[in-house]
């Protein structure tokens, strides 16, 4: 259980690699930002939009808000502070992403707390593989646990209508927003578990 200290992480995106040491250096200079800081989470995109969540074991007050806002401008990131039953959003709690899939651009917004694919290149390859192996159809598509519409939105171009389910409120909100960003109107997102969907399909529940 020995702790191994590292000063860089080569498997994350170049932008996160660049921001990490700058962020840690600036945090270490301010006791209010450093005090009981438990963890840091990064949510980035290929557009270099970067959301950083600072997680604390203490309540965050106005002094923290002021310093976090200064930190945002110094590093050009978006910051959220989290502690028990507390979420402090300094500017925004989401990032913008643009994916080029089969030579077509799709716009997405990823919200903090929602599920996202961590490897953008692999994600694009997965979506393209599915699209390239499905013929255009006049039939409908049902997708379970759709997240923020990562597969749903590109796949909607292949089908008449799409019904997509998800249990996360955050993901459903993002999915509906992502439909608007891409001017897609043939998808209906509903909040429902797979078990509930099967019950509805079998007419066990309304």
For each feature predicted by the language model, list its residue ranges.
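Short, aliphatic-rich beta-strand segments
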Residues: 5, 48-57, 107-110
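Extended interfacial segments that mediate partner engagement and assembly in macromolecular machines
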Residues: 1-35
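Rossmann-like S-adenosyl-L-methionine
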Residues: 57-206
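Residue-level recognition of well-ordered beta-strand positions that form the cores
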Residues: 41, 53-55, 98
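A short glycine-rich, hydrophobically flanked beta-strand micro-motif that places a catalytic Asp/Glu
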Residues: 35-44
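Short strand-connecting beta-turns/loops that link adjacent beta-strands
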Residues: 45-48, 102
């Amino acid at each position: 259980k020995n702790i191994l200290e590292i000063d860089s992480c080569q498997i994350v995106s170049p932008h996160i690699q660049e921001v990490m040491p700058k962020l840690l250096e600036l945090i270490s200079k301010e006791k209010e930002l450093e005090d009981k800081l438990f963890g840091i989470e990064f949510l980035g995109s290929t557009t270099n939009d970067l959301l950083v969540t600072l997680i604390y074991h203490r309540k965050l007050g106005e002094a923290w808000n002021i310093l976090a806002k200064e930190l945002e401008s110094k590093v050009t990131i978006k910051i959220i502070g989290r502690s028990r039953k507390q979420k402090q959003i300094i500017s925004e709690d989401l990032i913008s992403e643009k994916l080029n899939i089969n030579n077509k651009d799709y716009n997405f917004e990823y919200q903090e707390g929602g599920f996202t694919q961590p490897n953008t290149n692999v994600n694009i390859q997965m979506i393209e593989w599915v699209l390239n192996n499905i013929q255009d159809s006049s039939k409908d598509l049902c997708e379970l646990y759709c997240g923020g519409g990562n597969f749903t939105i590109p796949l909607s171009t292949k089908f008449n209508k799409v019904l997509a389910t998800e249990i996360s409120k955050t993901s459903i909100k993002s999915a509906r927003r992502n439909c608007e960003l891409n001017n897609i109107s043939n998808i209906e997102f509903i909040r429902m578990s797979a078990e509930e969907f099967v019950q509805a399909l079998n007419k066990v529940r309304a």
